[in-house]
């Protein structure tokens, strides 16, 4: 049976991950630790014999720079890359820039958990005159006003990620190309929910660690057979738990 592999990598720790702030579409860069995580992911992929024909990432530099570091370790810096806003992190609306623990102290752990992980729950909206509104950013100049979010739930994130998967990424895989995607916690959760047919309750509890390669294997009909992280299982579990705890009051 022919098996096709897909590699997903959430960006390494960003400066705002480190500061425990809601990031969303804000274009913050990797922390030193995040760069190290990205390089380690690349080394791990090389050790496991992976190489690629094409890469996808978002238009946010924490994902782009993660991909650069991964490809550098693989000696595949030449690889063609498509960047799309459809792989961006979920837009966190008016929460962007706020400290997660302080927000939990103000609104309660459960409210923040729902804002972070609830399937159809949207954080408070931005206004269009807010400097954080993506309509002010030249990288989104070609998007219609309807496409520019004021806030997003995971459900709304799925609405942009899955058509991009089906229309753009999957056909390339079906043509025989080996693909890697470097993206974000929630754009990857959107894809994982779809691939694994997870319920809304199941996705609520899913936390994807930074900078750890997640491998999906597909059968000849491009149905997922299995998935697994590369690396030390205990370390990966600890990183996922740390992601879950970011939204709790101290």
UniProtKB/Swiss-Prot annotation:
Residues annotated as site: Transition state stabilizer: 184
Catalytic activity: (2R)-2-phosphoglycerate = (2R)-3-phosphoglycerate
Catalytic residues (UniProt): 11, 89
Gene3D superfamilies: Phosphoglycerate mutase-like
GO terms assigned for molecular function: phosphoglycerate mutase activity
EC top class, as a word: isomerase
Biological process annotations from GO: gluconeogenesis; glycolytic process
PROSITE patterns noted in UniProt: PG_MUTASE (PS00175)
Keywords associated with the record: Gluconeogenesis, Glycolysis, Isomerase
SMART domains according to UniProt: PGAM
EC number: 5.4.2.11
Domain of life: Bacteria
Pathway note: Carbohydrate degradation; glycolysis; pyruvate from D-glyceraldehyde 3-phosphate: step 3/5
Positions of substrate binding: 10-17, 23-24, 62, 89-92, 100, 116-117, 185-186
Function: Catalyzes the interconversion of 2-phosphoglycerate and 3-phosphoglycerate.
Subunit organization: Homodimer.
PANTHER family noted in UniProt: PHOSPHOGLYCERATE MUTASE (PTHR11931)
HAMAP family: PGAM_GpmA
Family: Belongs to the phosphoglycerate mutase family. BPG-dependent PGAM subfamily.
Protein name: 2,3-bisphosphoglycerate-dependent phosphoglycerate mutase
